[in-house]
Amino acid sequence: MALRLNGSSSGYVELDVPAAAGSHTLTLPDGGGSSGQYLQTDGSGGLSWASVTTGKILNVWQGVFTGIQSFAPGPSAPGPRADITNLSVTLTPTSASSRFLITCSISMGGASNSPAYYLMRDSTDILLNTSSLGATTLATWGSHHSGNTGYIYSTDLQTISYVDSPATTSSITYKVQGQNAFGAGVAVFVNTSQANGRAAPDPNYYNVRGCSTITVMEISS
């Protein structure tokens, strides 16, 4: 039998149950709940008010590098890796279930070289390409500039985003390392072009010096 609730002037709301064997009791909670809440069941007929849980941004950190840095090539193989100045943040997670959205933007320049970048948590690479082919450099991201002379005046903005789940409440550091993956080439520059970053820099207006950043957002699970 359906239960019909008539409106004060017109219309009604009718509650009905399917034709099924057995009896079921639903117990309503005390009170009217709060704005935006919904009724949930405990699986045994008990109803209660609950709030929708979604991820929220708990904290935001940022590292900014406005200077100039270079990475030398190796004699016949990739040069050494090194931290990019100021592109690091040290934090303590609010919860072990927190996730972290890391966004890195690097302004780089050079010609006849291959800049490679590595996203790290403490001393561990947390995102690397795995499709090795011969002597391929496996990095988080990077690019290659040909020997075209025009590239010595250019800068590119390289950007990547990644969500990390460190599962800890201990202090951690997110950072970016750089490397010149081209052997016997010329230097890779952060925040300037090759023409503007070399020992005898070209001071003309067409050489743009930029900025690089790392931003980390802690998101509740």
Language model features by range: what are they?
Residues 83-85:
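Short, solvent-exposed loop/turn segments enriched in Ser/Thr/Gly
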Residues 1-57, 96:
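Extracellular repetitive beta-rich solenoid segments
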Residues 12-14, 25, 88, 159, ...:
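Well-ordered beta-strand positions in beta-sheet-rich domains
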Residues 13, 36, 88-90, 203:
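Generic recognition of flexible, low-complexity loop/linker segments
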Residues 64, 71-81, 90-171, 175-221:
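Terminal beta-strand-rich extracellular "head" domains
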